Amino acid sequence: MALVTNVCEYEELAKHKLPKMVYDFYAVDAEDQWTLRENSEAFSRILFQPVVLVDVSCIDMSMSVLGYNISMPIMIAPTALHKLAHPEGELATARAAAAAETIMTLSSWSSCSIEEVNLAGPGVRFFQLSIYKDRNLVQQLIQRAEKAGYKAIVLTVDAPWLGRREADVKNRFTLPQNVMLKIFEGLDQGKIDETNGSGLAAYVASQIDRSFSWKDIKWLQTVTSLPVLVKGIITAQDTRIAIEYGAAGIIMSNHGGRQLDYLPATISCLEEVVREANGRVPVFIDSGFRRGTDVFKALALGASGVFIGRPVLFSLAIDGEAGVRNALRMLRDELEITMALSGCTSVKEITRGHVVTESDRIRRCSRL
């Protein structure tokens, strides 16, 4: 295998290695895929404003998330069905996250169980939760996560319906026999209807409670003592409401473009959300992060940390646990270099003054 020098190269390699149906499931987004492109392009409109002649002989990227110390502000977002990428699936991902001393978020659409991932080894892990019609199932999942030592619930709020991912329809996406949705283990997966071209999506969507609303977050807090991070927010209004309903944190996300197309890039909405949160809760962010420079820009605009998704899946597909370790290492190295060249020796030293946004440039021009 050729030397991989950045995480984007893993995606290109995975495109040639994975079955088309699997690659498209991971890579292709909703409808016109405008948001997918914008998630990446928005970073190119944010420029650096470095500070020079600073002693950067020692760079400290460590930080604390909900009281847990991690080595860097880069964490693993919840993504589905890792065994489609590699036989060890989420177990390999969990080991790589632990080796990097960072947080892994296990998807409730995982191909390994909550307990199996816990047994993969030590590490700080969060559990992503969708709200299903069967509240007993939801409560059981939470109890299992608590018993297994997961440290927080990541509640997905932007997917009451699944986005229309046309590639899955064309490919008639279904699960191979050796991969299953572990949260549905014991249920009749023969119920998955293959006739509509996207059997998995149709079956899982049918289990999601489309009536779920803000008041149900209060119910969730009655069945768990774990902090609840609300994932899928991109506006100040929803940030305010989430905090009012007791969210322990916000994870800004547009689902990587997989849900509603023509959403703005999360990085473009970050300052609005951070201003509304006003330090009351941490604001994390995902969607489109592919470089350490992207991470730096988010931190400069007020994010408390960044979650990555697809780079994990594609690096896992190419080289298993070692691939995910390498992807995390490359992002860490890129962030370290960016911090040093910007004059920052710790995450806390990264400030708004280190970047210039498109809005900044417009304001400057208007004063001329």
UniProtKB/Swiss-Prot annotation:
Keywords: Flavoprotein, FMN, Glycolate pathway, Oxidoreductase, Peroxisome, Photorespiration
Highest taxon listed in the record's lineage: Eukaryota
Assembly and binders: Homotetramer.
Functional pathway: Photosynthesis; photorespiration; glycine from 2-phosphoglycolate: step 2/3
Site entry (Involved in determining the substrate specificity of glycolate oxidase), positions: W109
InterPro entries: Aldolase_TIM, Alpha-hydoxy_acid_DH_FMN, FMN-dep_DH, FMN_HAD, FMN_hydac_DH_AS
List of residues binding glyoxylate: R165, H255, R258
Cofactor notes: Binds 1 FMN per subunit.
Gene Ontology CC terms: peroxisome
Any one GO BP annotation for this protein: response to other organism
Predominant location: other
The protein, known as: Glycolate oxidase 2
PROSITE patterns, A to Z: FMN_HYDROXY_ACID_DH_1, FMN_HYDROXY_ACID_DH_2
